[in-house]
Amino acid sequence: MAQADFVSPTSIDVSEKKEVEFHKKVDHVENPPLSTESAKLEAEEVAAEKLNSEHLLENEFAPITDPTHRRVSKNPDGAELFQFEDEPSYYYVVATYLTYLVLIIIGHVRDFFGKRFHKDDYKYLKDNDGYAPLYNHFDNFYVRRLQHRINDCFSRPTMGVPGRVIRLMNRYSTDSNSTFKLTGDTSLALNVSSYNYLGFAQSHGPCATKVEEAMQKYGLSTCSSNAICGTYGLHKEVEELTANFVGKPAALVFSQGFSTNATVFSTLMCPGSLIISDELNHTSIRFGARLSGANIRVYKHNDMTDLERVLREVISQGQPRTHRPYSKILVVIEGLYSMEGNFCDLPKVVELKNRYKFYLFIDEAHSIGAIGPRGGGICDYFGISTDHVDILMGTFTKSFGAAGGYISATPNIINKLRVTNPGYVYAESMSPAVLAQIKSSFLEIMDNSPTSAGLERIERLAFNSRYIRLGLKRLGFIIFGNDDSPVVPLLLYNPGKINAFSHEMLKRGIAVVVVGYPACPLLTSRVRFCFSASHNKADMDYFLRACDEVGEKLQLKFSTGAAGEDVGKTNVEKMKKNQGWFKPPRWKIEDVLKHGVHDALTQ
């Protein structure tokens, strides 16, 4: 097995103590004293520790095992955005609703008896000494009686770099998941849950070196807001790099991605204006839109027909009651929807923009750096000029391995935000160390040379996304999203399988993120995989084998098989499928791995 192959996580255990000792000794060994026996032994010891350090680097970012495992992420010229929508049989849908019904009934029965025999446990839900409860019984029901059952799957503490593998801090509960205690030991697992799309979150390498240099020069914090004395030269450099990269004339950086969306709309919009939002836009967008005081309309997710219907209605009818025209209309969409794994239909949105003359705001938190031939986001993916987009928003948390967010637009908009946006004027400015990480990541990505490490990461991510998606579909799972998306939602449906899937994958040394209501619709509980450029084919093969085993064990292969491209080869098969008594084909795992590379590169 190659050195970078992912074996069992229990067999990978790099000692942190040895790593620290290695860094203490390395300067001494580079300039050794007289050639004595002790010096030779010390040099041999450091050489061995250096191998351990190199192994640590491979745990964070695996070297590519085959130079052909790269792909350009772009939409074929003239091709319409297409996503095959698969659904389970009615049996699984009914079973899911019945499961929720049983859980709700049991929860109410427990509450009925609990309020009478364990009154102290319900004090916080009732008036207490003149104080009203902060939340009532109904609002708290889901958390107490449903989410509480699978609480051990969420917010698992970790340590170290969220790279190719991640170290989990083991814990246990003695009070039915109300609280957790750490055991003191850790487990190493393949990481398919972090947003580290391009693998820039590393403890070693050019980015880490620049971060260390920035900390030594500037310290850890600016201790001020941008409006006072918290703007360094690094802030200006990163803003200029951001604007150049996304293709807009100016940019503004914020210390947090969530607050970027939460505060930007109150600066741009006002009462009498209108925000039209996709129904699955991120919470930060919804929060910011409500703060703005503008009217808000929602259209069906990625449904351009419904968006046009809303546009025609609001333009013709105007504001409620007065019917006066809206002062301005802003359509807000995301480049890549983080829970669905699909792209916005940007070509059709731009077509509607040219027809109905609204302003366009795109949240590229997950798409910037992750898609497009040069990682330029959704506009780069479709080959559409950013001139068609009025405001581009994004975060540095995902592809850049840092923190914070940005707004990129015309100088007039940026200058207005610079003096009126509360998230910029009053909040702490971005840390110099974070700025150094962003700057070094940008320079890697923007290097257009044939041997560019940044370009390799972008193309590795595109290949990995295709390879995993195709493999899971052929195994029989229902997968949401577009084929080039690095966000891969696998549908579980039944809430009882959320906990089971998480634990079964963890037994096989794989850390996953499971998602349930209210983060997603009640019926479509899911697990969300986020692959990165740090994974190689051995990692993905190990992952697919584990999914195949767990999928069989938990009966998760609901797909019709159409997405796996092996349904309806003959008219008889098509007829059987349409009549509902056709058994979907399932690829064997050996065939999936055998044909996966070729098909991921050619389809």
UniProtKB/Swiss-Prot annotation:
One Gene Ontology cellular component = serine palmitoyltransferase complex
Q: Catalytic activity, per the record?
A: L-serine + hexadecanoyl-CoA + H(+) = 3-oxosphinganine + CO2 + CoA
Statement: the UniProt record of this protein carries the keyword Transmembrane helix? yes
Pathway(s) where this gene product acts: Lipid metabolism; sphingolipid metabolism
Top EC class, one word: transferase
Q: Does the keyword Cell division apply?
A: no
Molecular function per GO: pyridoxal phosphate binding; serine C-palmitoyltransferase activity
Keywords for the protein's UniProt record, in alphabetical order = Acyltransferase, Cytoplasm, Endoplasmic reticulum, Lipid metabolism, Membrane, Pyridoxal phosphate, Sphingolipid metabolism, Transferase, Transmembrane, Transmembrane helix
Q: How does it assemble?
A: Lcb1 and lcb2 encode essential subunits of the enzyme and form a heterodimer.
Q: Which PANTHER family match?
A: CLASS II AMINOTRANSFERASE/8-AMINO-7-OXONONANOATE SYNTHASE, LD36009P
Q: What this chain does, per the record?
A: Catalytic subunit of serine palmitoyltransferase (SPT), which catalyzes the committed step in the synthesis of sphingolipids, the condensation of serine with palmitoyl CoA to form the long chain base 3-ketosphinganine.
The family note in this entry says:
Belongs to the class-II pyridoxal-phosphate-dependent aminotransferase family.
* Protein name as catalogued: Serine palmitoyltransferase 2
The protein's organism comes out as: Schizosaccharomyces pombe (strain 972 / ATCC 24843) (Fission yeast)
